[in-house]
Amino acid sequence: MAKKITGYIKLQIPAGKANPSPPIGPALGQHGVNIMEFCKAFNAKTQAEEGTITPVVITVFADRSFSFITKTPPASVLIKKALGIESGSSVPNKNKVGKLTKDQVKEIAAKKMPDLNAASLETAMKTIEGTARSMGVEIV
């Protein structure tokens, strides 16, 4: 029989940089999970993308064991990385912070495809373009 699930924890942690300080420590501590064990496992799994924000869903079981699934980085993080900018525009309709080519959008959409609710690469590209526009990035 499968283990009884007591909860899910969703966090966004920089890859390879999980440590027991907040927000990770308190979130895992209240479910009775071994915090250092999670940090070591997460850092080992994500060391290839060092520093990139990585969403993780942790499943906590009744015996205080856990499993976790890492997702692809948020689209906004991938867009900022592609353009080399620190943040999006505070007024996206007026101030543009950069230009993203269709090829860059396609590359980001392909990377995000497993986590997007899109049937094809074209619809995934439209989702990424919408995120980029809301950040004040032009699509060329």
From Swiss-Prot:
<dbReference type="InterPro" id="IPR006519">
    <property type="entry name" value="Ribosomal_uL11_bac-typ"/>
</dbReference>
<dbReference type="InterPro" id="IPR020784">
    <property type="entry name" value="Ribosomal_uL11_N"/>
</dbReference>
<dbReference type="InterPro" id="IPR020783">
    <property type="entry name" value="Ribosomal_uL11_C"/>
</dbReference>
<keyword id="KW-0694">RNA-binding</keyword>
<dbReference type="InterPro" id="IPR000911">
    <property type="entry name" value="Ribosomal_uL11"/>
</dbReference>
<dbReference type="GO" id="GO:0003735">
    <property type="term" value="F:structural constituent of ribosome"/>
</dbReference>
<dbReference type="Pfam" id="PF00298">
    <property type="entry name" value="Ribosomal_L11"/>
</dbReference>
<dbReference type="GO" id="GO:0070180">
    <property type="term" value="F:large ribosomal subunit rRNA binding"/>
</dbReference>
<keyword id="KW-0488">Methylation</keyword>
<keyword id="KW-0689">Ribosomal protein</keyword>
<dbReference type="InterPro" id="IPR036769">
    <property type="entry name" value="Ribosomal_uL11_C_sf"/>
</dbReference>
<comment type="function">
    <text>Forms part of the ribosomal stalk which helps the ribosome interact with GTP-bound translation factors.</text>
</comment>
<keyword id="KW-0699">rRNA-binding</keyword>
<dbReference type="InterPro" id="IPR036796">
    <property type="entry name" value="Ribosomal_uL11_N_sf"/>
</dbReference>
<dbReference type="GO" id="GO:0022625">
    <property type="term" value="C:cytosolic large ribosomal subunit"/>
</dbReference>
<dbReference type="Pfam" id="PF03946">
    <property type="entry name" value="Ribosomal_L11_N"/>
</dbReference>
<comment type="subunit">
    <text>Part of the ribosomal stalk of the 50S ribosomal subunit. Interacts with L10 and the large rRNA to form the base of the stalk. L10 forms an elongated spine to which L12 dimers bind in a sequential fashion forming a multimeric L10(L12)X complex.</text>
</comment>
<dbReference type="GO" id="GO:0006412">
    <property type="term" value="P:translation"/>
</dbReference>
<protein>
    <recommendedName>
        <fullName>Large ribosomal subunit protein uL11</fullName>
    </recommendedName>
</protein>
<keyword id="KW-0687">Ribonucleoprotein</keyword>
<comment type="similarity">
    <text>Belongs to the universal ribosomal protein uL11 family.</text>
</comment>
